[in-house]
């Protein structure tokens, strides 16, 4: 792969510069990056709505809320723990990731749904999405929930993963 070769070239170039052999540095290979997912991996709005509908019909409200939160806010799966009971009051979550703070706005419809969800689930403090030990859900549980609902909704599992819901948010 060109990107792997470029990594080696960068390492060699750094060594050459450290040794003051600047004339030995070589150019990296130009790589054309694709801006979008291949169409066969792109989740459509229709498929997303089917996932949510099936989750609700299966009485799997946690998965339905999870889908709507990931798609409605564009957050990363690792940032889900910052969606907590306190932030539902103001509709804003401060996410600390990669050394930065980002302010996530919760759409009012999602905010209302999440408030109802935490009330029905008797979640008083902490993360909205908790495991059975009242700890924030980890990425493995999120993935398994999404794959399970994809099978029930007859949506290709190749298309259903947390980051693809982030892309859906960016496209809509």
Regions found by a protein language model. Name each.
Residues 1-172:
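Conserved catalytic core of the tyrosine transesterase superfamily
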């Amino acid at each position: 792969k060109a990107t792997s070769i470029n990594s080696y070239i960068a390492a060699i170039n750094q060594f050459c510069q450290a040794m003051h052999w600047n004339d030995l540095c070589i150019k990296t290979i130009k790589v054309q990056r694709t801006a979008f997912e291949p169409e066969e991996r792109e989740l459509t709005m229709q498929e997303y709505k089917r996932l949510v509908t099936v989750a609700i019909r299966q009485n799997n409200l946690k998965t339905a809320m999870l889908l709507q939160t990931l798609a409605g806010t564009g957050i990363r799966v690792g940032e889900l723990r910052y969606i907590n009971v306190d932030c539902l009051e103001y509709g804003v979550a401060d996410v600390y990731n990669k050394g930065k703070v980002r302010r996530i706005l919760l759409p009012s419809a999602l905010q209302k749904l999440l408030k109802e969800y935490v009330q029905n689930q008797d979640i008083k403090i902490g993360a909205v999405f908790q495991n059975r030990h009242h700890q924030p859900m980890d990425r493995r549980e999120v993935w398994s929930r999404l794959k399970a609902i994809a099978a029930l909704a007859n949506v290709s599992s190749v298309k259903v993963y947390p980051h693809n819901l982030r892309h859906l948010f960016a496209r809509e």
